[in-house]
């Protein structure tokens, strides 16, 4: 199971970095966690952001703000990646 999670983490990491997201940010960490959970078939798909907030002991609005900020930063840096 850990090998599978490590493989997913690597794939998600490569994808997020190819989109210009920075691994050192909280938004990246939150997105990485949420995507790995979804790829593993979490039963909480409709509440993945709430689950992410609970996992990181953060308020939901803080998690969403960090994710939006990181995606916006990546878009401003290179909008072509999102075409």
For every predicted segment, state its role.
Residues 4-26, 33-35, 40-83:
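Basic, alpha-helical nucleic-acid-binding regions used in initiation and control of genome expression
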């Amino acid at each position: 199971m850990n090998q599978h999670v490590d493989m997913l983490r690597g794939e998600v990491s490569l994808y997020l970095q190819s989109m210009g997201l920075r691994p050192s940010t909280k938004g990246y960490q939150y997105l990485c966690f949420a995507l790995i959970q979804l790829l593993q078939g979490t039963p909480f798909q409709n509440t993945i952001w709430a689950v992410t907030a609970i996992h990181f002991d953060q308020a939901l609005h803080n998690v969403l703000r960090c994710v939006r900020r990181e995606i916006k930063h990546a878009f401003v840096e290179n909008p072509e990646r999102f075409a």
